[in-house]
Amino acid sequence: KSTLASLIPRLYDVTDGSITLDGRDLRSLRQNDLRAQIGVVTQDPHLFHDTVGANLRYARPGATDAQLDDACRSARILDVVRALPDGFDTLVGERGYRMSGGEKQRLAIARLVLKDPAIVILDEATSHLDTENEAAVLDALAFVLSGRTSIVIAHRLSTVIDADEIVVLENGRIVERGRHALLRDAGGLYADLWEGLVRDDARSVDHADLAD
């Protein structure tokens, strides 16, 4: 699945077959032009040892303070940034203020908003987050992904149930594709994964009741 995330921005090209965008083979497009239209959020986004503002402006060097505010508001991270010791001037990264996994993800989403790409790739963007942080990130993504071509690579079904089309891969091959309800009722691999998720959720509720 992550190989696909590398093929779309042409980090390397397919050796057999083709990948098309609006009917055009990606190999016919200039790499710089293609990548300028793509934004990526991975499971562990990188923050440079720099200020929050500088990390955001890597996506748009000329961004104004108001644009930083708007991007962070869209990514549901503005209140967190304002609460930092020096706001947008707070040093983060390797030797700076350590942000939580959910905060880093939402900062990466804010960077995505500033870039304003036509195509968004999310590569396991919520896989390392707890339930509370995942909910905050998904809330941010629901707003940001609206109206864009979005490719979401995920193991967590909660991330993709609202997708226009879900593609199920097994051993590098497509075994199912369709919308959530269709795949859930088809009795295939996706249905098995969904049933497992439902069982896990039921156990969590039972454990919570016992704890109470």
Enumerate the language-model features and the residues they cover.
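ABC ATPase nucleotide-binding domain helical subdomain, centered on the C-loop/LSGGQ "ABC signature"
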Residues: S18-G23, S28, R35, G53-E94, ...
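Catalytic Walker B motif of ABC-type/P-loop ATPase nucleotide-binding domains
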Residues: V120-D123
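Conserved catalytic loops of ABC-family nucleotide-binding domains
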Residues: F143-V152, V160
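Helix-to-loop junction immediately C-terminal to a conserved catalytic motif
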Residues: P9
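Hydrophobic anchor residue at the start of the ABC signature
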Residues: I109, I153
